[in-house]
C-alpha cells in the first residue's frame, strides 16, 4: 500500500521460486488525503480499506488464504493506528514499514531482479517518499528514506516557505 497506488501481487511457487500469477494496481492517491499535520482523513482511510477489501474478495475467489500487506509512506502518519485498525478489518495481516525497512526491501527487490549486480545504489521514487540504498559485495551498506516523493513534491508550491521547510526537514534527517 503506497502513497499513490495500492498493488495486489499473487505469487505461486514454481520450482522453489515465486512466480507472479496476478498483478493489479489501483490508483488510490492516498497522499491526497493526508493534511499538513500528517493526519489521514476518514475518506482516505475508507478509500484504502475499500481497495483492500476488493482485493480480499478477489483472493477469496482464488482460494488464497494467507494475505499480508506492507504499508509504506501512507502509514508514516500521526493516525497510523487508526489506519492499521481499519485495514485489519479486511482480514489482511498489516505490516507498517519504516522508511529504512522500505529501502531494505528495495535492495532485496533489486538483488532478486539483477542477481549479477553486486555493487551500486538503488533509488525508489514513490509518491510520498524516496528511498536510497547503497550496496557493496551484494550486501546493503547504507539505507535511507526521505519524506519527499513525486506526488508530495508536486503539491508543494515552488519557492515558498512551506516547500523550503519540507526540503530542509528532509535534509536535516540525513546530513551530507
Give the role of each language-model region:
Residues 53-67, 169-176:
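Phosphate/pyrophosphate-binding loops at sites that engage ATP/ADP/AMP, CoA/4′-phosphopantetheine
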Residues 1-5, 123-129:
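A short acidic Gly-Thr/Ser loop motif
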Residues 58-85:
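Short beta-strand-loop/turn "lid" adjacent to the catalytic site in phosphate-handling enzymes
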Residues 154-176:
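ATP/pyrophosphate-binding catalytic subdomain of soluble kinases
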Residues 98-121:
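Conserved phosphate-binding catalytic cores of ATP/NTP-utilizing and phosphoryl-transfer enzymes
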Residues 92-97:
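A glycine-rich helix N-cap at a beta->alpha junction
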Residues 5-43, 136-162:
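Short glycine-rich, Thr/Ser-proximal phosphate-binding strand/loop in the N-terminal lobe
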Residues 71-75, 126-128, 176:
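Glycine-rich beta-strand-to-loop/alpha-helix junction loops that act as flexible
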Amino acid at each position: 500500500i503506497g502513497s499513490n497506488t495500492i498493488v495486489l501481487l499473487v505469487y505461486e511457487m514454481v520450482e522453489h521460486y515465486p512466480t507472479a500469477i496476478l498483478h493489479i494496481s489501483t490508483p488510490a492517491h492516498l497522499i491526497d488525503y493526508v493534511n499538513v499535520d500528517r493526519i489521514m482523513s476518514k475518506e482516505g482511510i475508507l478509500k484504502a480499506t475499500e481497495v483492500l477489501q476488493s482485493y480480499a474478495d478477489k483472493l477469496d475467489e482464488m482460494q488464497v488464504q494467507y494475505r499480508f500487506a506492507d504499508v509504506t509512506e501512507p502509514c508514516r502518519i500521526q493516525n497510523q493506528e487508526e489506519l492499521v485498525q481499519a485495514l485489519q478489518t479486511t482480514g489482511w495481516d498489516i505490516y507498517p514499514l519504516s522508511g529504512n525497512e522500505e529501502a531494505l526491501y528495495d535492495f532485496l527487490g533489486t538483488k532478486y531482479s539483477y542477481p549479477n549486480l553486486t555493487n551500486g545504489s538503488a533509488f525508489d521514487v514513490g509518491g510520498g517518499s524516496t528511498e536510497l540504498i547503497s550496496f557493496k559485495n551484494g550486501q546493503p551498506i547504507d539505507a535511507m528514506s526521505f519524506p519527499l516523493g513525486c506526488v508530495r513534491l508536486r503539491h508543494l508550491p515552488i519557492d515558498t516557505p512551506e516547500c523550503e521547510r519540507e526540503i530542509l526537514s528532509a535534509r536535516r534527517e540525513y546530513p551530507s
